[in-house]
């Protein structure tokens, strides 16, 4: 029996009503795996390929044949907005079969949640943080809620398979299974899993089931891709004749930027009017600055505002307004956004995406590109690379267009190799260990040290953590009143621990700044960190406001709307760039080939950079003398191997080589003063790298590198160990030094 015939009649009717001519490859593959095996399933297919329906069509079919006696399926999504969107899509489908769909997160009313608690059934949509809260506060309900749980669907699994948030998701699944007594199958969905086999193993480890990864033939997809370069302080009117060479059918300007506009911003302004577009940026700070600039251009041109804003610090009302406008087929507006619209929220028929500078990963590039190209249109991305004009006497590193090279490298890695970054899980997730220890103890009330260790260390995420490390943690938590010992010898949450566990921010394991809610009269605008004093200006929600009052006790900022332009600040999160990206950037400088998506300014800038690289030898010789005792090292390493190299130079080699004034620009180059010469530099590095040394030796004396949210509650020894063994890529650093040694022989 083919997959379509196996579907329940109401799903077949849904397919007919939507005029689908055939099932997509991912839907056939998913149906076969769900219907004909009892394994987990990892579905890897392009954005907008129908993965959500592929997972739920067979699940709903099985439910109609044998209805679960509790919640039958959990859908875990990384964003509330994604859950809200999927809630609308699934509700229409499930209404036909009388299968309820529930969603549970911070913006959902308590009455909706109470209905689920009284009548556990159907499908529950939830974020990892809300699932944590549910297990913590509704501990006694879990067996009744999920006793007959059959499936857990993890959407955008790549975004939940890295760092502490990924580890938390896996821990939650295991804890849920233990508490409920259920053995659900896991279905992971993603467009950009870099290493499917590794992701499959993680799903298997936390569920005790084998994971199958169907081979899905990807159909040929055409992209519309362009990349242009601008100097930030260049002339306002970039040369119009430079347009149209790469993408002539796309490049007709529909507006005119004001005189003396920032060239890159003007380019975006002129090519978005009358269209539905997204403009992606890499930080919330930049999101505010770009939106404010583009809105100011509308004002100067006496045009109505046509720009929206969407990022994680905005209030739900602002975000949902932007989403609703983007879905409205009659409104042609452009939304400036961060990663919050990178994931699969349905925001309608988008014509074009812009990316200001390069994203940090191939995965992010593909997700952002994939927001367009739906409903019959090809995916379309315009890169806008911006750079400060190098001064005439600038040193070599400042003359290299790093973001342009990075953008080209990301595109080439995927088009040439179909390469995407593998997921990176922390080897020693001690911050998460604290979090799960406190969550486990808070939910069960009291446990003996042995029982607590058994519950927590048996979670697959902590398989590398030793009993000795855990004893060290528990002793420290006792000494800091995070936990207490009862008269009977058991452990309970202590007074200091209660302050953490009872705070709503405890449910999340990702790092948060101390945020202040910003209000103007009765309107909530969003949140900022480190508010300026009254009388100063802030940028939020794409407008400029003057601060009238700051209430530090209640974390509130009151302000009024004004005109002007100020930088916005929300706290920046530097990206994790893979070594393979840096190596491909080097290759871009070496190879003598063009790329069809480069526009004329970008072609000229790349040509100039290649000449600079050739004349200086920076792609052939990693160490370049900048004059006198100033040197620059170009290691072409990713973020964590670069960090290891930087510390290795300071702590292992600086004394012998006479290195001082070391100044890194991560992860591109390291400038420093050095008394030694080039040969001695490489000899010393090779000798030191050949020695066996403890990674802890690359932690500075007295340093306690707090990287993760709960590191502050750990003993210093574990923080240092987690950083040295889990963050620093010492193997990658040593491998690069070995390559230099081999090439010099």
Please give the residue ranges for each predicted region.
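Long C-terminal interaction/binding lobes of large macromolecular proteins
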Residues: 362-364, 375-403, 426-427, 457, ...
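Short, charged/polar, Gly/Pro-enriched secondary-structure boundary elements
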Residues: 232-235, 497-504, 565-568, 676-682
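Short, glycine-/Ser/Thr-/acidic-enriched flexible segments
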Residues: 284-285, 341-342, 359-360, 388-389, ...
């Amino acid at each position: 029996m083919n997959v379509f015939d196996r579907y329940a009649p109401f799903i077949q009717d849904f397919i007919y009503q939507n005029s689908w001519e055939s099932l997509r490859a991912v839907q056939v593959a998913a149906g076969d795996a769900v219907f004909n095996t009892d394994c987990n399933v990892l579905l890897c297919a392009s954005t907008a390929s129908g993965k959500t329906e592929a997972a739920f069509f067979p699940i709903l079919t099985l439910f109609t044949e044998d209805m679960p006696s509790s919640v039958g399926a959990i859908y875990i999504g990384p964003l509330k907005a994604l859950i809200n969107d999927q809630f609308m899509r699934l509700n229409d489908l499930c209404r036909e079969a009388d299968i309820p769909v529930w969603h549970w997160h911070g913006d959902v009313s308590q009455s909706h949640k109470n209905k689920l608690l009284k009548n556990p059934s159907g499908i529950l949509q939830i974020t990892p943080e809300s699932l944590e809260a549910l297990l913590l506060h509704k501990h006694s309900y879990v067996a009744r809620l999920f006793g007959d749980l059959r499936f857990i669907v993890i959407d955008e699994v790549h975004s939940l398979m890295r760092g502490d948030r990924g580890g938390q998701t896996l821990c939650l699944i295991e804890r849920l299974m233990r508490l409920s007594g259920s053995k659900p199958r896991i279905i992971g969905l993603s467009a950009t899993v870099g290493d499917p086999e590794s992701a499959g193993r993680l799903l298997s480890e936390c569920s005790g089931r084998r994971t199958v990864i169907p081979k899905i033939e990807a159909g040929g997809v055409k992209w519309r891709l362009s990349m242009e370069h601008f100097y930030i302080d260049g002339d306002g009117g970039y040369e119009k004749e430079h347009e149209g060479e790469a993408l002539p059918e796309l490049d007709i300007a529909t507006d005119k930027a004001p005189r003396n506009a920032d060239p890159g911003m003007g380019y975006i302004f002129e090519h978005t009017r009358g269209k539905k577009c997204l403009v992606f940026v890499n930080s919330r700070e930049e999101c505010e600055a770009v939106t404010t600039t583009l809105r100011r251009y509308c004002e100067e041109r006496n045009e109505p505002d046509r720009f929206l804003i969407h990022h994680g610090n905005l209030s739900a009302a602002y975000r949902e307004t932007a989403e609703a406008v983007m879905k409205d087929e009659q409104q042609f507006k452009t939304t400036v956004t961060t990663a919050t619209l990178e994931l699969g929220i349905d925001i309608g028929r988008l014509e074009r995406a812009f990316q200001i500078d390069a994203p940090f990963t191939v995965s992010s590039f593909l997700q952002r590109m994939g927001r367009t190209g739906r409903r019959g249109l090809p995916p379309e991305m315009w890169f806008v690379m911006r750079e400060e004009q190098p001064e005439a006497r600038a040193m070599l590193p400042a003359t290299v267009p790093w973001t342009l090279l990075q953008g080209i490298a990301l595109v080439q890695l995927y088009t040439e190799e179909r390469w995407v970054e593998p997921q990176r899980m922390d080897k020693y997730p001690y911050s998460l260990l604290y979090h799960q220890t406190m969550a486990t103890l808070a939910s069960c009330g009291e446990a003996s040290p042995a029982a607590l260790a058994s519950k927590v260390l048996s979670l697959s995420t902590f398989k590398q953590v030793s009993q000795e490390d855990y004893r060290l943690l528990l002793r420290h938590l006792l000494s800091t009143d995070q936990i207490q010992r009862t008269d009977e010898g058991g452990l309970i949450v202590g007074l200091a621990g209660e302050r953490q566990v009872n705070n709503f921010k405890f449910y999340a394991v990702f790092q948060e700044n101390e945020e202040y809610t910003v209000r103007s009269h009765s309107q909530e605008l969003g949140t900022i960190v480190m508010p300026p004093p009254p009388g100063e200006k802030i940028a939020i929600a794409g407008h400029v406001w003057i601060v009238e009052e700051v209430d530090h006790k209640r974390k509130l900022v009151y302000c009024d709307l004004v005109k002007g332009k100020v930088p916005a600040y929300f706290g920046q999160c530097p990206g994790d760039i893979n070594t393979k990206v840096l190596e491909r950037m080097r290759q871009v400088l070496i190879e003598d080939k063009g790329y069809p998506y480069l526009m004329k300014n970008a072609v000229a800038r790349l040509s100039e950079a290649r000449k600079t690289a050739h004349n200086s030898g920076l792609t052939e010789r990693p160490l370049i003398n900048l004059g006198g005792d100033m040197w620059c090292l170009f290691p072409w390493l990713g973020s964590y191997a670069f960090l290891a190299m930087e510390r290795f130079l300071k702590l292992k080699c600086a004394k012998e080589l006479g290195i001082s004034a070391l100044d890194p620009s991560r992860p591109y180059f390291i400038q420093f003063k050095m008394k030694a010469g080039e040969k001695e530099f490489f000899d010393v590095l090779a000798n030191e790298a050949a020695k066996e040394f403890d990674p802890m030796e690359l932690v500075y004396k007295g340093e306690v590198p707090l990287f993760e949210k709960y590191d502050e509650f750990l003993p210093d020894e574990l923080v240092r160990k987690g950083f040295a063994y889990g963050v620093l890529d010492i193997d990658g650093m040593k491998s690069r030094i070995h390559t230099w040694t081999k090439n010099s022989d």
